Amino acid sequence: MNIQEIKDLMAQFDTSSLREFLFKTNEGELIFSKNEQHLNASISNQEHAVPVPQVQLVPNSTASEASSPASVKDVPVEEQPQAESFVAEGDIVESPLVGVAYLAASPDKPPFVAVGDTVKKGQTLVIIEAMKVMNEVPAPCDGVITEILVSNEDVIEFGQGLVRIK
């Protein structure tokens, strides 16, 4: 992919309503994002800051290994003792689509679920907004919420964990 093609993609992304865009090729990945979490902290301090599209080119591992400098040294990683590791119990409810997660029906309403709540199969856990459509994510089984893995208004990916039910 040449520079002009990348510039064209960037211009199209900038004028679109997309918040994130990932383009994979044999050469690597091209990631565009308009999300505020990717912005430089100095921009957020300005009075009328406008989100600036961020571009990140991530090369494939074979390309990065070939171009890595010889001065990079392998450092052994020490393993942590098993006693300190935390193993969470329960099943993770995954996102069925890409979108924005909402933990409540509206900002002034209480969340659908909280840690410790008992839920019934089919009860709404989260709403995911995708293309201006609100999609309810139901509980796949009866159980107790042990962990909420996303925050309100997080941009989430397909298959990303939303809540853990035991």
Curated annotation (Swiss-Prot):
The modification N6-biotinyllysine is found at residue 132. Pathway: Lipid metabolism; fatty acid biosynthesis. Residues 61-82 are annotated as: Disordered. Residues 61-70 have a biased composition (Polar residues). GO terms for molecular function: acetyl-CoA carboxylase activity. GO terms for cellular component: acetyl-CoA carboxylase complex. The keyword Lipid biosynthesis applies. Pfam families: Biotin_lipoyl. Residues 90-166 form the Biotinyl-binding domain. This is Biotin carboxyl carrier protein of acetyl-CoA carboxylase. It comes from Streptococcus pyogenes serotype M6 (strain ATCC BAA-946 / MGAS10394). The lineage of its organism: Bacteria, Bacillati, Bacillota, Bacilli, Lactobacillales. The gene is accB.
